[in-house]
UniProtKB/Swiss-Prot annotation:
Protein name, entry field: DNA primase large subunit PriL
GO annotation, cellular component aspect: primosome complex
Coiled coil: none
GO function term, MF aspect, one: 4 iron, 4 sulfur cluster binding
Pfam family, one: DNA_primase_lrg
Assembly and binders: Heterodimer of a small subunit (PriS) and a large subunit (PriL).
Keyword Lipoprotein appears in the UniProt entry: no
Binding-site list for [4Fe-4S] cluster: 230, 301, 310, 317
Function text: Regulatory subunit of DNA primase, an RNA polymerase that catalyzes the synthesis of short RNA molecules used as primers for DNA polymerase during DNA replication. Stabilizes and modulates the activity of the small subunit, increasing the rate of DNA synthesis, and conferring RNA synthesis capability. The DNA polymerase activity may enable DNA primase to also catalyze primer extension after primer synthesis. May also play a role in DNA repair.
Composition bias type Basic and acidic residues, residue spans: 340-356, 362-381, 388-413
Protein family according to the UniProt entry: Belongs to the eukaryotic-type primase large subunit family.
GO terms (BP aspect): DNA replication initiation; DNA replication, synthesis of primer
Organism this protein belongs to: Methanosarcina barkeri (strain Fusaro / DSM 804)
Keywords: 4Fe-4S, DNA replication, Iron, Iron-sulfur, Metal-binding, Primosome
Length: 413
């Protein structure tokens, strides 16, 4: 990938190696006047992601290439410091949309190579692209328009045929997914947070104004780690190629739909099952999702026990009566823990700052003491010096007087 493409697609895998080769330290990126343009542009792309579209103007000079490339890691630092899940999703979406506009102008060969960076193995013939249906489902599942459903696509020997425009749209989803997964950034140094604080305050103020315009789901991002044991067990079996009983398949599917997973995402989970049939499975999932007008809810714990699907019961299970209640409680506890951790970090940071302030004050007082001691010693030395000077003067005067007296004595004799 040449420097121009690196600047346009800074989230590509090989860009990190290029940035490392520039030998620009984090401290330099944050503080050096040489990278002021990168910081300004980084803040600009973050603010533009809130306001509407991230605009990129291709200039093709060395200065622009450097500032545009380094503006991305600076923007990432700002997004990480904001630490808001909805904002992160918004930023990732707008970066992906901005990139897709440039991808539309790229050659077929470049698009195929670019797709490989995201694990998409595709082929192209004339103006059409073909890709494996699993890759198609992975990146199309978050697109809600009916035209993107697998049943509405041309399928040939497990390969989905799409136009160049649609292939670029899928690449956009791949970019969005990669950027979202790059957050949160663990353990941001306190000095970085302090430096970014004014930027972050401005970003948060702007985001709060626009927040109501952005959509979100009831549960937010789906978090499989927080699923109840019964659903986690079912998922592990499905991914291991084990064929689930009908009642467990229904329970798992209805649960996943309820927490925000799309039909195509769930379909992709079942594609390793020994009896997998894409059309039949898709029909079953859509039926549970409400294709016939009746949306099915996941069964309660009592029903799960009746059918022998209550597996791996833990302590939290004793306090709830529905798998969704388990998931809600886990999300609450995680958010509470995160909030407490944040408060703890803020408290530790505050204590650290106070200790630093006390230390600085102590050092300041020590400096004052040293200065006073030095001044006292200098004053004492000065007095001693002046005393010795007076003694020498008196001694000299005494000798002069004695000499004069001797001369007068001689004259009298």
């Amino acid at each position: 990938m040449d420097e121009e493409h690196i600047a346009l697609y800074p989230f590509a895998s090989e860009v990190s190696a290029y940035v490392e080769s520039l030998r620009v330290s984090l401290e330099s990126l944050l503080n050096s006047p040489a990278f002021r343009r990168s910081r300004v542009r980084g803040m600009e792309r973050v603010m533009q992601s809130i306001e509407g579209e991230i605009e990129t103007t291709l200039i093709k000079d060395e200065s622009w290439l450097l500032s545009e490339t380094l503006s991305y890691p600076f923007a990432q630092i700002l997004v990480a410091c904001v630490d808001d899940q909805l904002f992160t999703k918004r930023y990732a979406l707008k970066e992906a949309e901005a990139a897709s506009k440039w991808l539309e102008k790229e050659s077929t060969d470049f698009l195929l190579e670019f797709g490989e960076d995201f694990g998409i193995q595709a082929e192209a013939e004339e103006l059409q692209f073909s890709m494996h249906f699993a890759d198609y489902i992975r990146f199309s599942s978050s697109i809600r328009e009916p035209v993107w459903k697998l049943t509405n696509r041309q399928l040939r020997s497990g390969m989905v045929v799409v136009t160049k425009k649609d292939f670029v749209r899928l690449l956009q989803e791949a970019i969005k997914e990669r950027i979202e997964k790059s957050f949160p950034i663990p353990k941001i140094p306190s000095e970085v947070s302090s430096f970014c604080a004014p930027y972050v305050a401005e970003i948060k103020d702007k985001f709060e104004v626009h927040k109501k315009k952005f959509g979100t789901t009831d549960f937010g991002v789906v978090e499989p780690d927080l699923f109840p044991p019964c659903i986690s067990h079912a998922l592990a079996n499905v991914q291991g190629g084990v064929n689930l009983a009908h009642s467990m398949r229904f329970a798992m599917t209805s649960f996943l739909l309820s927490v925000g997973m799309s039909v195509d995402e769930i379909l992709n989970l079942f594609n390793v099952s020994p009896d997998f049939d894409a059309e039949v499975t898709l029909y079953q999932i859509e039926h549970i999702a409400g294709a016939t007008g009746n949306v099915y809810k996941p069964p309660a714990c009592d029903t799960m026990r009746t059918y022998g699907n209550c597996i791996g019961k833990d302590r939290l299970c004793e306090k709830i009566n529905h798998p969704l209640a388990y998931y809600e409680k886990k999300i609450y506890l995680k958010n509470k823990e995160k909030e407490m951790e944040k408060e703890k970090e803020e408290k530790e940071e505050k204590e650290k700052q106070e200790e630093k302030k006390e230390e600085e004050e102590k050092e300041k007082q020590e400096e004052i003491k040293k200065k006073k001691k030095k001044e006292k010693q200098e004053e004492k030395g000065k007095k001693i010096k002046e005393g010795k000077k007076r003694e020498r003067k008196q001694e000299k005067e005494t000798k002069r007087r004695e000499g004069k007296e001797k001369q007068e004595e001689k004259k009298r004799i």
